[in-house]
Swiss-Prot record:
Outcome of swapping residue 51 to A: No change from wild-type
Entry keyword set: Antibiotic biosynthesis, Chaperone, Cytoplasm, FAD, Flavoprotein
Residue ranges the record marks as coiled coil: none
One GO CC term on file: cytoplasm
Name of the molecule in the record: FAD assembly factor SdhE
Quaternary structure and interacting proteins, as annotated: Monomer. Makes weak or transient interactions with SdhA. Interacts with YgfX. Interacts with FrdA.
Induction (UniProt): Transcribed under both aerobic (with succinate or glucose) and anaerobic (with glycerol with or without fumarate) conditions. Part of the sdhE-ygfX operon.
Family, similarity comment: Belongs to the SdhE FAD assembly factor family.
Phenotypic consequence of residue 19 to D: Restores aerobic growth of deletion on succinate, does not impair growth on succinate in the presence of wild-type SdhE
Consequence recorded when altering residue 16 to R: Binds decreased amounts of FAD. Does not restore aerobic growth of deletion on succinate, less growth in LB, does not restore SDH activity
Organism expressing this protein natively: Serratia sp. (strain ATCC 39006)
Lineage of source species: Bacteria, Pseudomonadati, Pseudomonadota, Gammaproteobacteria, Enterobacterales
GO BP annotations listed: antibiotic biosynthetic process; respiratory chain complex II assembly; succinate metabolic process
Keyword Cytoplasm: yes
Result of altering residue 19 to A: Does not restore aerobic growth of deletion on succinate, less growth in LB, does not restore SDH activity. Greatly reduced flavinylation of SdhA in vivo; protein has wild-type secondary structure and still interacts with SdhA
Length: 88
């Protein structure tokens, strides 16, 4: 997936679990454009992971072994925490 194809990335952010939507969508909407190209690629790679893995990582029930994905999970958690609750 191309890092500049925002409609496709937006679609990929839509998950089958509301908990993931609440974590991933606000990050995409508020922070994606500020990411470096490397972080955008890592975000896209993260979106290609299975929902159960994403859920566990974002809820601190484990972490990815891949350092780029680990960094992205941490970045999503930090930015979402700093932003505060987001209504969906």
């Amino acid at each position: 997936m191309d890092i500049d194809n925002k409609p496709r990335i937006h679609w990929a952010c839509r998950r089958g679990m509301r908990e993931l939507d609440i974590s991933i969508m606000p990050f995409f909407e508020h922070d994606y454009d500020t990411l470096s190209d490397d972080d955008k690629r890592n975000f896209i790679r993260l979106l290609q992971c299975d929902d159960p893995d994403l859920f566990n990582w974002l809820m601190n029930h484990g972490e990815p072994t891949d350092q780029g994905l680990k960094h992205m999970v941490s970045l999503i958690q930090t930015r979402n925490k700093n932003r505060g609750p987001v209504a969906m």
